[in-house]
């Protein structure tokens, strides 16, 4: 886990100023934070919350960030968290973002920190699970905030930590996610020059950071198709329209 964090820190150092170097003791700092990082991840994995319902998750994050002595804004975008670290050297304003919501999935693994949480989703009682790695994302960004705060004098510019709710999509007609964070002006004060998201990937070697300019990871959206049929007598099917047959061909 600490290798993932190291990758993020190295990436941040390169992004803010390729002339900057991480402090010589960052390796020791990583080792010290690793047990806490693992503990956080297991806590969030065991206590997942659905989109726009991340009340306990957001509070847990905000309460910890406040102990670091940095500016914390909570709640934002319903259940999200924003924190600001002003570095000791001049530089850009860069945001690091992690998503915090879980999915309506039943966890079926024999782990001591497996989720047993249930919630209502779509009018049904469902299991809730961090099946997309957001528990890791939260923990990595919290640890990054801790380490960058510890080396605040060496940080060039300002770092904005964004813990985004409802990344998987706000339920129903609710607002949420990145759009709501932007709408509330979280990228305007301070004026963020670049935002870097974070996502783990089982196909990427541990300790490796992949990045590129512009958009990188795909997005998904929802749409509904309504197929209208036409009834007819069973002996005269040609007089009707079978919506099942038509739907199967879409």
Question: Where are each of the predicted segments found?
Answer:
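Metal-dependent amide/peptide-bond hydrolase catalytic core
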Residues: 20, 67, 244-250
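Acidic/His- and Gly-rich active-site-bordering loop/insert found
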Residues: 20-129, 139-156
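General alpha-helical segment detector with a strong preference for membrane-spanning helices
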Residues: 6, 103-105, 138-139, 203, ...
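Bacterial Sec-dependent N-terminal signal peptides
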Residues: 1-22
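Histidine/acidic-residue-rich, glycine-tolerant segments that coordinate divalent metal ions
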Residues: 118-129, 135-136, 148, 153-249
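A generic structural signal for short
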Residues: 8, 15, 29, 49-50, ...
């Amino acid at each position: 886990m600490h290798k993932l964090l190291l990758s993020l820190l190295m990436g941040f150092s390169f992004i803010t100023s390729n002339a900057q170097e991480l402090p010589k003791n960052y390796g020791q700092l990583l080792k010290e934070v690793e047990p806490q990082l693992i503990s956080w991840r297991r806590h969030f994995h065991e206590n997942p919350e659905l989109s726009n319902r991340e009340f306990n998750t957001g509070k847990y994050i905000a309460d910890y960030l406040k102990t670091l002595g940095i500016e914390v804004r909570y709640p934002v975008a319903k259940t999200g968290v924003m924190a600001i670290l002003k570095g000791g050297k001049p530089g850009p304003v860069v945001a690091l973002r992690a998503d915090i919501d879980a999915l309506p999935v039943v966890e079926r693994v024999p782990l001591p920190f497996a989720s047993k949480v249930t919630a209502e989703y779509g009018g049904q009682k469902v299991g809730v699970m961090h099946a997309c790695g957001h528990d890791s994302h939260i923990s990595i960004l919290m640890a990054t905030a801790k380490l960058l705060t510890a080396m605040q004098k060496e940080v060039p510019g300002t770092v904005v930590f964004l813990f985004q709710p409802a990344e998987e999509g706000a339920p129903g007609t609710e607002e949420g996610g990145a759009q709501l964070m932007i709408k509330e002006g979280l990228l305007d004060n301070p004026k963020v020059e670049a935002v870097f998201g974070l996502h783990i990937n089982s196909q990427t070697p541990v300790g490796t950071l992949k990045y590129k300019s512009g958009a990188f990871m795909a997005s998904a959206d929802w749409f509904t198709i309504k197929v209208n049929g036409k009834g007819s007598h069973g002996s005269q099917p040609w007089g009707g329209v079978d919506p099942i047959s038509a739907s199967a061909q879409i």
